Structure formats: C-alpha cells, structure tokens
Amino acid sequence: MTLDSYNIFNDEYLFNMPLSPLPKVLGNFETGQSVLTLTTPTLTPTTTRNIEDTLGHLLSDTQTDRVAGCAGFAVPKVLPNAMGAIDALGMGIPTCVSSLPLQQTYDASLGQGSESEDSNASYNDTQMNEEQDTTDTSSAHTDSTSYQAGHIMVGSVNGGGVNNFTNVLAAVSSSRGSASVGSSNANTSNPPARRGGGRRPNRSTNMTPEEEQKRAVRRERNKQAAARCRKRRVDQTNELTEEVEQLEKRRDSMRKEFEALTNSKKQLEYLLATHRSTCQKIRSDILSVATCNGLIAPDGLLSAGSSGSAASSHHNHNSNDSSNGTITGMDATLNSTGRSNSPLDLKPAANIDSLLLHIKDEPLDGAIDSGSSLDQDGPPPSKRITLPPMSTMPHVHLSTLITPTGASSGSLQTPITSTAPVGFGSAFPVTSNGSSINNINSIGNSMNSPTLNALNKVPKERPNTLAFQRPLGQMHLTMANNKAGGPTQIQGVPIQTPSTGTFNFDSLMDGGTGLTPVSGPLVPNSSSTNKHPLELPTPTAEPSKLVSL
C-alpha cells in the first residue's frame, strides 16, 4: 500500500481549507516543479542572485507574517508537549523526530524550486496559488514531504482522517520552526515581500531605464492593438446587427405588400366571376357589327334592305366566326378564349367594281346626295334627276335644248356629260304640256332597264371612292385666254348669244341667266313647278332645262 491511496491528501480535501497555512507553504515548494520547461536552465550571476533572494525571503518568513497573511486569524502554535499528547493517543507516531534530515530535504526542495522559478519567471506566487491548487503535483509533494518528515504515516492505519491531518500540520510547523532557527545566523536580511499582479513579476529594481522604457512602449502598443481589435469586433458586430435589422424590416414590408397584392388578386377574381355573364351578353349583343359587301354597316340598314331576293345576293358576311355575319372580336381583351383573332377582312367584294361604275358624278356645289348619306336627319330634300348621255338618247335633239334669252334670238347649247344614276324615281317632278312630256317619258322608258330596277332595290350605301370631273378649270382657262371678248365656248360648245361679254361674276353666281355651265347631271328642284321670271316660254312650248346654282 502506497501513500497515494489515501484520499485525505488530495487537493479537494487539503487545499480548500482557507484558514490553513499549508497551501501557501506547499505552493512555494512547487513553484517551478509543476510546469515543464522547454529550455535547460543556465546558472548565471543574475540567476544566482535571484536564488539567494528567494531563499532569504522564504527562510525569514516568521510566524507573525504568516498570521498577518491569514486575515487576522492566529494559528495555534504546536508545542513539544502536543507531540507527546499525540503519541499518547496511540497513533503510533514516534516522538523523536530528527531535524537534520528534514532541514536537508527542505533546503534541497527550496534550491530546486528556486532554479526552476527563474526559468519560468512568467508565473508569480499569486497566480500559482490560484492555478495550481487543483493539480496532482500538490498531493504528490504533500506525500513526499510527509514521508520525508520523519515517516509520519507509519502507524496511521487505525487512525481517522481528522487526526491524520492534524499530525501533518504539526509536522510541518515543527519543521519550519527548526529550519528558521538553524538559518537565523546565516541570513539576517529581511527583503520586502514580492507583490506582483501581472503576467510577469515586478523586478523594476534589476532593470535598466532603457529596458523599462521598452517595456512601457511595448505595453502601450499592446494595449492599443487590443483596443483596436476589440473596437473592430464591436463594429463588425454592430454592422451585422444593423444588416439583420434592415433585412427583417424588408421582409416585413415585402410580407405586407404580398398580402395586399393577394387581397387585390382575390377581389379582381371575384369581380371577374360576377361579371362573366354580363360580359357574355355584351359580347353577343352590343359588340355585334354586321358587314355588307366587305364594309361595316349598321344592322338597321341591312334589315331594311334584306327583303328582296336580289339584294340578299349582294351581301357578303365577313366576320371572325363563320357561323353568323356579326363581328364579335372588336376588342381582343373581350375574347373569352384569350387568343388573338385574325384581323378583319374589309376588302370590297368583286361586284363593288360594277357598282362603282354607276355612281354619279359629284355636282359643282359640293352637295351630298341625300340617298347616299347614312347619318342624315330630318326630311329628305327634293330628288335630283340624272339624265343619260346625249349619245344614248334616241329621240332628243339638240334643237330642243336651245333656250332663248329674252328678246335675243341666240341660244345656249348646254352639253350634258354624266354616267348612269345610282337611283331615281319613276316619274319626274316636272309637269308641262306638249311634246316635251312625251320626250321625257320616252327618256324615262329607255332608262327603265332590269339592271337599274335591281339597283333601285338595293339600299344605298356611302361609296368609298368618288370619280368626278371638274370642267370648271377648263372654263377658267378659256376665260383667261379670251379676256377681251369674254368666254365664247364651254367644253368646245360655242355660246351663241349676243350678250356673252356683258355678264360679270355676280351675275354668274346669281344664276338663271342661261350662261351657267353645267357638267354634271341636271337636277331640277322643287321650284321648277313655279315658273321662274327668266324662264320665258319658247315657240315650241318646251319648258326650260336650265339649272341655277
């Protein structure tokens, strides 16, 4: 059985006693023995002096200094009769303790600890007492010290733990007392106790001013570097914290925006669901546009003109869907299927070319035919009659168109150049007697052809092209060439009146003089039933066929 098997000498039991002077003593013993050094200690004059100072400090430490370091608690002294009392208790401890081997062992321990202390000068007494209290080296030194101090634990098998600890304290106190008495004559100096509180011991007395200055500069530089490091870490932590806060705020704002957009989406979906039936009705009724011959026309016009079978053959249904004649794709967004429809085919049909040939020429006054207007309100004006070209009139002679002008015997031959009319009535509003009625009836009978009758049944539409002539420019050119004598002919027809140069622009604009050039159709108005003052009866009793602007 070895001494290490006894648990009473472990650190937790031995060094946790705050009132015992043993921890400090043992701490001084194990100052340099608990830490391994990487370099071999070299004995120098400085090291020798440090060893001497340490020995003097340890050997001159009296009982009064020990009591002063224990917070004012006086440790009871161990007297020689106490050793006799301990021996009387039957503990088996011998009363004769040799002081010479103990002193030699103590001196050896001190010397060894001093040499290693200089090599490990970075540790002081306070730090060693704080850090080395729980090491296994402490119990080992305690066992070795107790074993060397007179074989204290020889007969302690039958004793208790408290008695054994008391024996250890008594042995240590007696050994320190004998060591102090033996070394009092050798060293009488009492240096002050070393008071260090840092990484290295305070040895300013042995340092030169240059070394002290270097140490101060180095410490200041280290402090500044440590402060900068701490500041950098704090700044980095603050930046990361601010970034996290900003990201959290952004996340909250995006979450709110997402919720708002979700609510808007739900509302729009609800509105679409509720208005889907209404949109179907609008697409089928309101937006339906009918087409006729490739052109867009209202439904009323087609319904009015669709009674005849001949008119229905001219209708060309052009739409996006082939089932009916309505355009349901006016707006691509209203299409329920969402696909884009093909553009409308608004090219005119093939029979439009034949219809355009029968469109009458535009008159000089720029009036619009009431039959071709789709959006004209109010009562329609009097009808305008268009006569065919004179080459196609079999019974009409140029002599019937010669109109006298008052007392003069000259006549005006008015040329008539026009095309086939678009529509006209079956009877002229001109009422007269004589052969003129028969001539007009013969002209009307010659124009009653099946083609014109078929055209009368078709509803009139606004044409997209107008082919008309402006012979007035030729008349102006003729008047410019004959400034001295006035106009003598209109479109190659000579004016045979003696008063050709006596009329000015105002008389031409007033009309009714017989000199008004007419290149378009002759359209008698409602005033033709009443005789104009200038329209005098001719010897042949023919009515006047002059037109006033």
Swiss-Prot record:
Keyword DNA-binding: yes
Skewed-composition ranges (Low complexity): 177-194, 304-325
Stretches for region Basic motif: 214-233
Chain intervals with Polar residues compositional bias: 108-127, 333-343
Residues annotated as transmembrane: none
UniProt keyword list: Activator, DNA-binding, Nucleus, Phosphoprotein, Transcription, Transcription regulation
A GO molecular-function descriptor: DNA binding
Subunit structure: Homodimer. Heterodimer with Jra. The kay-Jra heterodimer binds more stably to the AP-1 site than either of the two proteins alone.
InterPro entries: AP-1, bZIP, bZIP_sf
Domain bZIP residue range list: 212-275
GO terms classed as biological process: embryo development ending in birth or egg hatching
GO cellular component annotations of the record: nucleus
Entry's family note: Belongs to the bZIP family. Fos subfamily.
Classification via SUPFAM superfamilies: Leucine zipper domain (SSF57959)
Its job: Developmentally regulated transcription factor AP-1 binds and recognizes the enhancer DNA sequence: 5'-TGA[CG]TCA-3'. May play a role in the function or determination of a particular subset of cells in the developing embryo. It is able to carry out its function either independently of or in conjunction with Jra.
Keyword Nucleus part of the UniProt annotation: yes
CDD domains associated with the record: bZIP_Fos
Region of interest: Leucine-zipper: 240-247
Subcellular location: Nucleus
Phosphoserine, modified sites: 342
Segments for region (Disordered): 108-143, 177-234, 304-345, 367-389, 510-549
Tree of life domain: Eukaryota
Identification of the protein by name: Transcription factor kayak
Pfam entry (one): bZIP_1
